[in-house]
């Protein structure tokens, strides 16, 4: 992706119901209710399924990923995920 190109100019990388794996540790940035800021929500290598696709700041996609082992649905950016 070039600097002047927005992620939203392209189709989403992941599809609904696609199995994905986390590429990094995900901590609460304050947007996950009931957990303290900085608390671990999911660890690198955990797997889940894309259950929703939204946008962030009109520049990038946010993928709602259901981490079945934890019972959480967390928002992830493309760089935090990989296909299984």
Describe each model-derived feature in a short phrase.
Residues 2-84:
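Basic/aromatic-rich interaction segments and small domains that mediate binding to polyanionic partners
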